[in-house]
C-alpha cells in the first residue's frame, strides 16, 4: 500500500512539473507585430511569444493546463476500480 501511494505521489509530482515547464529552446527569430495584423494562431509574435486567442502570449500561458483536482479524482476512481 505504501509503495502504491509513493508511486502515485511521484506520478502527480512529475505531471505537475511537466505542466509548469516552459520550453526555453523554442525562441522566435525577430518580431512580427501585433497578433491579427500578421501572424496567425500559433505563430511567433515576439522573441519568446506566440499568438494565442488573439493575444501575444508565452507558450506556457497559451497551453491548457491540467486541473490538479481533476487528476486526483481520476486517480481515486482508478484506485476504486482496481480493488
Curated annotation (Swiss-Prot):
The keyword Nucleotidyltransferase does not apply. Contains 4 disulfide bonds. Residues 1-27 form the signal peptide. Its main location: secreted. It is found in: Secreted. GO terms for cellular component: extracellular region. Expressed by the venom duct. Keywords: Disulfide bond, Ion channel impairing toxin, Neurotoxin, Potassium channel impairing toxin, Secreted, Signal, Toxin, Voltage-gated potassium channel impairing toxin. GO terms for molecular function: potassium channel regulator activity; toxin activity. The keyword Disulfide bond applies. The cysteine framework is XI (C-C-CC-CC-C-C). Acts as a neurotoxin by inhibiting voltage-gated potassium channels (Kv). Belongs to the conopeptide I2-like superfamily. This is Turripeptide Lol11.2. It comes from Iotyrris olangoensis. The lineage of its organism: Eukaryota, Metazoa, Spiralia, Lophotrochozoa, Mollusca.
Amino acid at each position: 500500500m505504501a509503495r502504491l501511494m509513493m508511486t502515485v505521489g511521484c506520478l502527480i509530482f512529475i505531471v505537475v512539473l511537466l505542466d509548469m515547464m516552459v520550453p526555453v529552446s523554442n525562441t522566435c527569430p525577430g518580431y512580427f507585430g501585433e497578433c491579427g495584423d500578421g501572424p496567425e494562431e500559433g505563430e511567433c509574435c515576439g522573441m519568446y511569444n506566440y499568438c494565442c486567442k488573439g493575444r501575444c502570449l508565452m507558450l506556457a500561458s497559451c497551453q491548457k493546463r491540467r486541473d490538479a483536482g481533476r487528476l486526483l479524482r481520476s486517480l481515486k476512481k482508478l484506485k476504486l476500480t482496481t480493488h
